[in-house]
Amino acid sequence: MNLLIMGPPGAGKGTQAEVLVKELKITHISTGDMFRAAIKEGTEMGKKAKEYMDKGALVPDEVVIGMVKDRLSQADCKEGFLLDGFPRTVEQASALDATLQDLGIKLDAVINIEVPLEKLMARLTGRRVCKNCGASYHVIFNPPQAEGKCNSCNGELYQRSDDNEESVGTRLNAYIEKTKPLIDYYEAKGILKNINGDQEISAVLNDILVAVK
């Protein structure tokens, strides 16, 4: 089974990807991991990507697509894969379609994890980090035993600047703006599966498995 997973920051996409690949016995292709591996192995596409990254420039689509094509051609993808973190735009999705066609691969479903905006805000702004040892807490899901204090070292907990409401709001709006056309693109192809991410992890997983089987 060949799948693609999407979801805004805070939707639990990473958690679902981890359990899903084990459940379906397919390969997890995270674009971040793929980049690191290609650069480390010194592949042709990895070298090209490194040139751009060293200059602090965005890696062009054709290089990313080249890396995705290399990765999908590897033996561990023959039994199926879960693509995570790519595509991010309709242009990339269209290029991915052409690549899959070249490789004779069919994309079976696109999983889109949906969580209401206010819930995402609560999830993302609730993180607290210990100034002393770096331990991470969450005011709702993993609160410290004593408010504002680390369980391990009694250090002071603080909210990172990129976890405040303004920063989180900007990130979420950017995601929505950028991916709305992508969601429409896959919906038009009839392979989009919208999943309610505002429930227990096991319930979300169950809904995904029902949707893709």
Swiss-Prot record:
GO terms, biological process: AMP salvage
Source species, domain of life: Bacteria
Binding site for AMP: 31, 36, 57-59, 85-88, 92, 160, 171
Chief location: cytoplasm
Enzyme Commission number, as recorded: 2.7.4.3
Region of interest: NMP: 30-59
Localization per record: Cytoplasm
Pfam families cross-referenced by the UniProt entry: ADK (PF00406), ADK_lid (PF05191)
Catalytic activity reported: AMP + ATP = 2 ADP
Chain residue ranges for the region called LID: 126-163
Entry keyword set: ATP-binding, Cytoplasm, Kinase, Metal-binding, Nucleotide biosynthesis, Nucleotide-binding, Transferase, Zinc
Gene Ontology cellular component list: cytoplasm
Residues annotated to bind Zn(2+): 130, 133, 150, 153
GO molecular function, one term: ATP binding
Top enzyme class: transferase
InterPro entries recorded: Adenyl_kin_sub, Adenylat/UMP-CMP_kin, Adenylat_kinase_CS, Adenylate_kinase_lid-dom, P-loop_NTPase
Record pathway: Purine metabolism; AMP biosynthesis via salvage pathway; AMP from ADP: step 1/1
Residues that bind ATP: 10-15, 127, 136-137, 199
Family recorded in the similarity comment: Belongs to the adenylate kinase family.
Assembly mode: Monomer.
Chain's role: Catalyzes the reversible transfer of the terminal phosphate group between ATP and AMP. Plays an important role in cellular energy homeostasis and in adenine nucleotide metabolism.
HAMAP family hit by this protein: Adenylate_kinase_Adk
Record remark: domains: Consists of three domains, a large central CORE domain and two small peripheral domains, NMPbind and LID, which undergo movements during catalysis. The LID domain closes over the site of phosphoryl transfer upon ATP binding. Assembling and dissambling the active center during each catalytic cycle provides an effective means to prevent ATP hydrolysis. Some bacteria have evolved a zinc-coordinating structure that stabilizes the LID domain.
Protein name, as recorded: Adenylate kinase
Species the sequence originates in: Desulforamulus reducens (strain ATCC BAA-1160 / DSM 100696 / MI-1)
